[in-house]
Amino acid sequence: MDLFYRLRSGKNNKLLYFVNSYAHEALWHGFYRSWRSILREARRRNDFAAIMSRVNYYCKAPGPQQGNTRAVRNFGRHEAASVYYFDLHKAMRPFGPDTQMRYLPGDVTTVPLLPTLTKSRPIKGDNANSVLLKLNAIRHFISVSDTTPFSAKKDAAVFRGKVMDKPKRMDFFNRWFGHPLCDAGDTSRAAGHPEWKTDFMTIAQQLGYKFILAIEGNDVSSNLKWIMNSRSVAMMPEPEYETWFMEGRLRAGEHYIRLNSDFSDFEEVMEYYLTHQAEAEAIAANARRYCEEFHDRRREYIISTLTVAKYLGLLDPADYQINS
């Protein structure tokens, strides 16, 4: 790993993010490319059908919807974390600051009554009113540099993260904390279970393990994306929530190793894959291929723009048509 990667613990650099975001915000008051121009660009691409498949996945609402809306310019930094503010404004830039919309920041685990732009939504059930955007991307989309072969990694699973007040993580710790096949630790400052408290571990250090636990917290597990981009394997129950990463499309045994929802089979699953490591390595390779879908920044911006355009078409069908 390079020195800069180690110094920032493998996470995205927030200073660079905010410098870039303020610069983009200033451009909004000058030049920005219109969404119709981006739509024309998309239609000229050979992968337009694949792009629209993702657009339709993120925005499932079937037809025009009425209800209260607000202009983009009226969503201020005081209403949510700055990263949500900047990511929203980046997505809305091709439409202008007076565009009317509905937006719900933060970790969203329920479905709004009306079509609304959100970061996350439940996977099961009717989730059409939750229209997904790539929000809080600096936390959830981390690129990792992992050159360590799977065979050279430690024969154990690892977890580092906040545990208290997160029921799924507490369930795992109550069952398996201290098990020899799992290096698990709670890095939160919350009171309770001092025996679970352990030292912080960088992403680079966690990548020294063959298996990394991706246990949902408030909504999705924020480490799942960088695990799947690495040569290690994600272990988790079937996900309950999804984001721009389309966790609902992940398949157990192909993209991640599935655990029971109560984690009762953790030891059994670990012992199986430690004696069938070629299968685990194949899952890691499949996961990396899945992640390649999200690596093309221009393509991702086109998909984001068309997702917003389709959503706005629900509110104002006359002005926003992407299928005509």
Where does each model-flagged region fall?
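C-terminal end-of-chain micro-motif
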Residues: 1, 323-324
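Helix N-terminus capping/helix-initiation residues
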Residues: 24-28, 202, 219
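Conserved active-site histidine-acidic residue motif and adjacent donor-binding/catalytic loop
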Residues: 190-204
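Secretory-pathway glycan-assembly enzymes, especially type II membrane glycosyltransferases
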Residues: 1-193
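Extracellular/periplasmic catalytic domains that process cell-envelope and extracellular macromolecules
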Residues: 95-96, 148-153, 204-207, 228, ...
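Eukaryotic intrinsically disordered and solvent-exposed regulatory patches
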Residues: 143-144, 198-200, 221-222, 243
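Catalytic binding pocket for nucleotide-activated donors in carbohydrate/polymer assembly enzymes
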Residues: 206-323
